[in-house]
């Protein structure tokens, strides 16, 4: 759908939480994600004011019913609502300001340095961290053989993520 839609803030937050993380994750992981979602949303409101337009993708209640099935909807929604309420008011701060808190479910075994990803020194707290269990996660590793004459990696960041690939005469950005 295009355009804007007014949604109660709590419903939007729970919908964002449902979109970003599986309701089957451990409760503490859900709580951590709730804090990240709240921080991101509050930061946007702080920057843009009360009429801020939220652009993060979220699940509507209808989406959640489709995702979980009608029979599991009430139980799962109540679980996310409880997690949201139990973390009420909790946000991530850095130097007295709401922090930018990018999220990814899995890495290639290391998180990335914020400066390398975002191109700015504005987020010095985003440092590389080893995450060895990420590479063991279900569905994380998949191999595909693609035959492309002359394809070669031209650059990688310090965590080993590919940031550039040359195919023939064209150089592609690994970030897009």
Model region roles, listed by residue range:
Residues 1-176:
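Conserved, single-site charged/polar hotspot
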């Amino acid at each position: 759908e295009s355009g804007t839609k007014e949604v109660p803030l709590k419903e939007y937050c729970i919908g964002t939480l449902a979109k970003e993380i599986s309701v089957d994750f451990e409760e503490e992981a859900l709580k951590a994600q709730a804090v990240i979602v709240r921080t991101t949303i509050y930061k946007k409101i702080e920057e843009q004011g009360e009429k801020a337009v939220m652009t993060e993708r979220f699940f509507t209640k209808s989406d959640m019913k489709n995702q979980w099935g009608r029979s599991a909807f009430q139980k799962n929604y109540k679980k996310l609502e409880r997690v949201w309420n139990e973390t009420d008011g909790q946000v991530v701060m850095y130097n007295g300001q709401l922090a930018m808190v990018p999220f990814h479910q899995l890495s290639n075994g290391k998180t990335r340095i914020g400066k390398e990803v975002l191109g700015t020194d504005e987020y010095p707290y985003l440092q590389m961290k080893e995450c060895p269990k990420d590479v063991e996660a279900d569905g994380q590793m998949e191999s595909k053989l693609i035959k492309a004459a002359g394809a070669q990696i031209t650059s990688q960041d310090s965590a080993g993520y590919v940031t550039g690939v040359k195919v023939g005469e064209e150089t592609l950005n690994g970030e897009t």
